[in-house]
C-alpha cells in the first residue's frame, strides 16, 4: 500500500471468538472479539487482547463485551466500536491520513437478511466505503486452495467459536448448507462445567480455553501425539481455598464427547442432503475442516473413522476464512458473483 494510496483493501473474518484482518496479503490483526467499555459514557477503553485481559476482572465502571454470539451480532453498537478499534490497528501511525476502506467480511451461510444487514451497517459505520459480504464456507474453501468454480462437489466444515458451518460447494455456489450453533464456545463451556462438577474447582472462561488448547481432544487414545498433563489452578467451590488439579486429555475427551457428537450428527445430516453425484465427489476428495475447532486433537481421525470419508485439516485452518476473503477481494472481477 503506497504513500498516495487513497483506497485500502481489507478482508475481515468477524468471528465470535476472534477477529482476523488481512491487508496486502498479510495477517495484520488477529485479536479476540472483545471490547471494554466505560459504563458511564459507553466509550471504548480497550479492544482485542487488551480487552480480553480485562474479561471477568472488571469493576463496576467497566464492562467487557463479546459483541457476537453464535456467529451473529448480538450487540450492534459494541460491534461497531470493536470493528472501528480493530481496523485502526491496521494503519495506526503509518500514514498522514486514513485511506478509504474497501472491505469484504465473512458471514455465516445461514445468516438471515436482518443479520447480513447488521454486519453491513456495522462495517459502514466503522468507515467502510465499499462493503462486500462473502459466505464463510466459500471463503474458507478459497483460503484452503479449492477451485470453487470447478464442476465437482467439495464439503467444508467450518467450526468457529459460535457456530459450525457445513456447506457443499460446486460451480461457484453453495448447493446445500447446514449451520448449527454448536462450536468452540460450547467446548469451552463443557470444560468449565466439568471442572466444577468433577473436580469442585471454579475455572474462568479463559482458563477453560487454556485447558482446551493444552489437553483438548476428540479421542481418548491419541497414541504418540498425546499431550502432557495440564495443571489447573483455581478456587475450591466449597471451601474457596486454592486448588491444583492435574488434567489429562482422556478426561477432557470424555467431557467434550456430547458436543463433538452434535457436530458429527450435523455433518451426517448434511451428507444425507447431498445430491448423489456430488456425494461421490466428496467421498473421492474428502471433507475439509476449517476454523479454530479444526485444531481439536483427533477430531479429523474421529470423523474419518465415523463417516468412512477422509477429513483433511489444512495448514492454517484458523485463518482460512480471512485468507479466502482476501483472495476474493483481490480478484473481485473473478469472484464478484460470490459477493453479497
How does the language model describe each region?
Residues 1-159, 167-287, 294-340:
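Nucleotide/phosphate-binding catalytic cleft detector across ATP-hydrolyzing
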Amino acid at each position: 500500500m503506497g504513500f498516495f494510496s487513497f483506497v485500502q483493501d481489507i478482508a475481515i473474518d468477524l468471528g465470535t471468538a476472534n477477529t482476523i484482518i488481512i491487508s496486502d496479503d498479510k495477517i495484520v490483526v488477529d485479536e479476540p472479539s472483545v471490547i471494554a467499555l466505560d459504563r458511564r459514557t459507553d466509550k471504548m477503553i480497550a479492544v482485542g487482547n487488551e480487552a480480553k485481559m480485562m474479561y471477568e476482572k472488571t469493576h463496576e465502571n467497566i464492562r467487557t463485551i463479546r459483541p457476537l454470539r453464535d456467529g451473529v451480532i448480538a450487540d450492534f453498537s459494541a460491534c461497531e466500536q470493536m470493528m472501528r478499534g480493530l481496523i485502526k490497528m491496521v494503519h495506526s501511525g503509518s500514514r498522514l491520513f486514513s485511506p478509504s476502506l474497501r472491505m469484504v467480511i465473512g458471514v455465516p451461510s445461514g445468516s438471515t437478511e436482518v443479520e447480513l444487514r447488521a454486519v453491513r451497517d456495522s462495517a459502514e459505520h466503522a468507515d467502510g466505503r465499499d462493503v462486500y459480504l462473502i459466505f464463510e464456507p466459500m471463503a474458507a474453501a478459497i483460503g484452503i486452495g479449492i477451485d470453487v468454480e470447478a464442476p465437482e462437489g467439495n464439503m467444508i466444515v467450518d467450526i468457529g467459536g459460535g457456530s459450525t458451518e457445513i456447506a457443499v460447494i460446486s460451480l461457484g455456489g453453495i448447493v446445500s448448507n447446514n449451520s448449527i450453533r454448536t462450536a468452540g464456545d460450547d467446548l469451552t463451556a463443557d470444560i468449565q462445567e466439568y471442572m466444577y462438577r468433577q473436580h469442585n474447582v471454579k475455572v474462568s472462561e479463559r482458563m477453560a480455553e487454556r485447558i482446551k488448547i493444552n489437553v483438548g481432544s476428540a479421542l481418548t487414545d491419541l497414541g504418540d501425539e498425546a499431550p502432557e498433563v495440564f495443571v489447573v489452578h483455581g478456587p475450591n467451590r466449597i471451601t474457596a481455598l486454592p486448588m491444583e488439579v492435574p488434567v489429562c486429555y482422556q478426561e477432557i475427551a470424555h467431557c467434550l464427547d456430547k458436543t463433538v457428537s452434535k457436530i458429527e450428527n450435523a455433518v451426517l445430516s448434511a451428507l444425507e442432503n447431498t445430491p448423489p453425484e456430488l456425494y461421490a465427489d466428496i467421498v473421492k476428495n474428502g471433507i475439509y475442516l476449517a476454523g479454530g475447532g479444526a485444531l481439536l486433537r483427533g477430531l479429523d481421525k474421529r470423523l474419518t473413522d465415523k463417516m468412512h470419508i477422509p477429513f483433511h485439516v489444512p495448514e492454517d485452518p484458523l485463518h482460512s476464512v480471512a485468507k479466502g476473503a482476501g483472495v476474493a477481494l483481490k480478484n473481485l472481477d473473478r469472484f464478484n458473483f460470490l459477493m453479497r
